[in-house]
């Protein structure tokens, strides 16, 4: 039994590398099944977000190199390139890492709540793929409990901060009066929903939601009095938009330099503020070369995020302590489980010996045997049978000079004295 947590995140890899190592939702089930099949992993789950791609694995023997090689091959990267950005956590450290991630302690925005939902989605997909078993299943449940405790018992979730909030904060810095600004939001997922909520609360003049399907865009738009359009309508909406924030699951860019350049001409070069939160990127990096465009990627949000971290450092320290306790408790319970099969077998063996001696005693009583004598014989017979196998093994270990094993037996049977005291005795 061994746990692995390995992958890359916003702290170790550039957005370019994260794009190439990201898994699409459609890939996950097949990728999980292939991962288990090709790396001798008994259980596995994959967490893939715009800021991280991580594998959580349970194996008989740790083989991080094999898993890293699989990840590199799957995404057509060189192993050296992946190693340069990857991290590996094993056993206790892997458990602690998972709990830190789910609690928002390892996020770009400290304490952001979305990561717990993403972790739950990773668990659900792994169950669908059939790659979650009893051990990873227990670890995920312990992880969810730890994250819930952190969220409930610390102030880390107060004054909610997220990548979405950071994007809107940047917009506020550039446009002094958002109530006169128009915003185009591309996508209709959780991040864009948060962006829409923040912009709506700030009284942005007009919000447009563009999505691949009009139905999904409309569902989001209705919540905030926004307008819904298709992706094909983006060029027309760009002309009217002062703020563009994009976060889709598209594998290809949604916005190119040419389209933005055309919109700027029609806007008479009135500036456009753009934030690309997606991985892979929705907006071609070359768009940032245009004079009247302020283009930010997720990696550019670090400065904004840093300001919001200050108020959360005290809460983070308390959260770290909770995570450490949760991880330690989980590993203790897990190691206790390792003894269950041995204890079960020992109990079954003891009950079989008890039943044999009991049947013998009942036969003696049925034949008129003295009850006191029969009970004494039952007690002696049961004692001898229960002690026979341990006695044989202890004598063998003693003959081999295995004082460590004798000390363990002494602890196991709660005996007084030290096995060392016998080592100085010489035969008479």
UniProtKB/Swiss-Prot annotation:
Pfam families: GlutR_dimer, GlutR_N, Shikimate_DH. Pathway: Porphyrin-containing compound metabolism; protoporphyrin-IX biosynthesis; 5-aminolevulinate from L-glutamyl-tRNA(Glu): step 1/2. Its EC number is 1.2.1.70. InterPro entries: 4pyrrol_synth_GluRdtase, 4pyrrol_synth_GluRdtase_dimer, 4pyrrol_synth_GluRdtase_N, GluRdtase_CS, GluRdtase_dimer_dom_sf, GluRdtase_N_sf, NAD(P)-bd_dom_sf, Shikm_DH/Glu-tRNA_Rdtase. This is Glutamyl-tRNA reductase. Disulfide bonds: none annotated. NADP(+) binds at residues 187-192. One of its GO terms (biological process) is protoporphyrinogen IX biosynthetic process from glutamate. Substrate binds at residues 49-52, 107, 112-114, 118. NCBIfam families: hemA. Transmembrane segments: none annotated. The keyword Oxidoreductase applies. The gene is hemA. HAMAP family: Glu_tRNA_reductase (MF_00087). PANTHER family: GLUTAMYL-TRNA REDUCTASE. GO terms for molecular function: glutamyl-tRNA reductase activity; NADP binding. Belongs to the glutamyl-tRNA reductase family. The keyword Isomerase does not apply. CDD domains: NAD_bind_Glutamyl_tRNA_reduct. During catalysis, the active site Cys acts as a nucleophile attacking the alpha-carbonyl group of tRNA-bound glutamate with the formation of a thioester intermediate between enzyme and glutamate, and the concomitant release of tRNA(Glu). The thioester intermediate is finally reduced by direct hydride transfer from NADPH, to form the product GSA.
């Amino acid at each position: 039994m061994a746990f692995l947590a390995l992958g890359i995140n916003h702290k170790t890899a550039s957005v370019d590398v994260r794009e190439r190592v990201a898994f699409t939702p459609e890939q996950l089930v097949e990728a999980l099944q292939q991962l288990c099949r090709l790396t001798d992993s008994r259980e596995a789950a994959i967490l893939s977000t715009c800021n991280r791609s991580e594998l959580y694995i349970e194996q008989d023997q740790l083989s991080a190199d094999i898993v890293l090689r699989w990840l590199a091959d799957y995404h057509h990267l060189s192993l050296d390139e992946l190693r340069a950005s990857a991290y590996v956590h094993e056993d206790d450290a892997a458990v602690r890492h998972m709990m830190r991630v789910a609690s928002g302690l390892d996020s770009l925005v400290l304490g952001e709540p979305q990561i717990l939902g993403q972790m739950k989605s990773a668990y659900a997909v792994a169950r669908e793929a059939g790659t979650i078993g009893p051990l990873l299943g227990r670890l995920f449940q312990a992880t969810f409990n730890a994250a819930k405790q952190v969220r409930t018992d610390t102030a880390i979730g107060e004054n909610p901060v997220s990548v979405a909030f950071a994007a809107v904060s940047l917009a506020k810095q550039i446009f002094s009066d958002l109530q006169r600004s128009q915003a185009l939001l591309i996508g209709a997922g959780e991040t864009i929903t948060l962006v829409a909520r923040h912009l709506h609360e700030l009284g942005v003049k007009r919000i447009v939601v563009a999505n691949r399907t009009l139905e999904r865009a409309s569902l989001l738009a209705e919540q905030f009095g926004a307008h819904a359009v298709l992706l094909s309508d983006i060029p027309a909406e760009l002309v009217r938009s002062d703020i563009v924030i994009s976060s889709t699951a598209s594998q290809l860019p949604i916005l190119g330099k040419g389209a933005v350049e055309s919109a700027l001409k029609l806007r008479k070069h009135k500036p456009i503020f753009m934030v690309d939160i997606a991985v892979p990127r929705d907006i071609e990096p070359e768009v940032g070369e245009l004079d009247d465009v302020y283009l930010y990627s997720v990696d550019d949000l670090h400065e904004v995020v840093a300001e919001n971290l200050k108020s959360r450092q005290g809460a983070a320290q308390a959260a770290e302590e909770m995570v450490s306790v949760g991880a330690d408790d989980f590993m203790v319970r897990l190691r206790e489980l390792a003894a269950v099969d041995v204890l079960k077998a020992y109990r079954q063996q003891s009950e079989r010996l008890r039943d044999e001696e009991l049947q013998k005693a009942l036969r003696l009583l049925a034949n008129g045997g003295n009850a006191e004598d029969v009970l004494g014989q039952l007690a002696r017979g049961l004692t001898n049978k229960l002690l026979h196998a341990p006695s044989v093994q202890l004598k063998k270990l003693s003959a081999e000079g295995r004082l460590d094993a004798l000390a363990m037996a002494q602890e196991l049977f709660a005996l007084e004295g030290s096995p060392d005291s016998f080592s100085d005795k010489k035969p008479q």
